Amino acid sequence: MNHRRLTDLTAVLAGTAVFFTILAAAGTKKAAQAVSGTVRTAAVVCTGAFCYDAPQTLSAADFCDFDGSGAVTQGAVIGFSQLVELSVDGLQEGAGKGVANYQVLESALSFVARFTQRERYADTLFRLTLPPGIYEMDGQGEPLHLYQNTWLSMEGVTLRKSDSDCSALLRNTPSGSAYAGYEANSNLVLTGGVWEVPLEHFDARSEEDRFSVLRFGHCRNVLLAGVTVSGCVNGHHLELCGVENCSVVDSTFHGYLDTEYHGKGDKKEAIQLDVVNNRWVAPGFPDFDDTITQDVLIYGCTFRNLCRGIGGHNAVYGRSYTNLAIQHNTFTHLSGEGVYALNYAHADLSHNQMKQVAGGVTLLALTDHPDDAYYAPAQGDLPAFDQLPVQSHLLSVTDNQIEVADGSEPAITISGGVYGDAQFADSYGGRTFWIEDVTLARNQVMSGHIVQSYVRD
């Protein structure tokens, strides 16, 4: 990121026009360009542009001490050759400004999308910086939308949900859109800031209140650094649904309200890794084509006063969440597990600290009631048992410190199982789902115990 500045660009957006003045490095040539469009009350000011003589990358190593050596994944690696710096004017602090603030920020993000959707800007990263402050946000049921090649910088900023609609604060796909594979808006960066959901706006007795806060689906290269998500209502603070190459570093997740939706105890993970299988698993993210989340790094994050920390409670027969690194995180005061996961493969869980949790690490190849968690493929036939790959294997759980609140519960559970439910009994009834190639080493279990079953080399 620290490279010679080859081009200076200044611009001001006001009303319906954007004027760019490009000053070449020698300072001898000037050009002006006007781009038509409506941006409501927003003002977007271009404060600089950088062109690099070699392709650049942005990754976790730019924001924390992760160096990538020996890691099962590097997470997000975002390449670019140009960086355009933009700032937003028009956000207002104080009560009653939520709708106006939403319009300002959504308009600014949409304006950036006019450029990022064009092929000529395919290798340009646009950094949109918000001024420090606490801003109410009311999308009247609609989230903000983050588009291709956009970096939202929020140091010193709190975006506070001021409505009681069960809607996310941010997502990467417009309502009504459909994508396959990892082809939705990608190369997305969030740095700094607080995304706040005031839990007092919602009713724990409600049978309807539930939503996730930050939602990403069908995409690749998502990077969060120094982000705080405060509060979630029977959903996920961060939902990764069919995401390839993601890094979440030095971020904080806290606050959870369990409502009566599906009854109390409907356990949810703060960071969910999921598969795009159906509209119940992945609402709002068609096409439902079993695009799975893989190559994820979660490093140096804090999880407190939650249900579960990281993982997921859905899986598809024959598909695995692969290349996952969960390292150097802290989990405290959880009513569920620090990590709860199905069908993980090539996963490294190391140097995490868990204290006052209901369970530490739970990695499963089959649950006790698989019909509640495992699905047939969205497309094609259910795989025959002898054609299934090993769904959970190459798991390393090392150098963790775990203190379970109730010492009678397991600190670490590594388990396969025997299928005994009804839905897929013809194909899988009585068959054993094994976990293979597990490494447990140097874990300090201060309370609780270790369970391994249906595990083999």
Identify the residue ranges that each predicted region occupies.
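Right-handed parallel beta-helix/beta-solenoid
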Residues: V39-E106
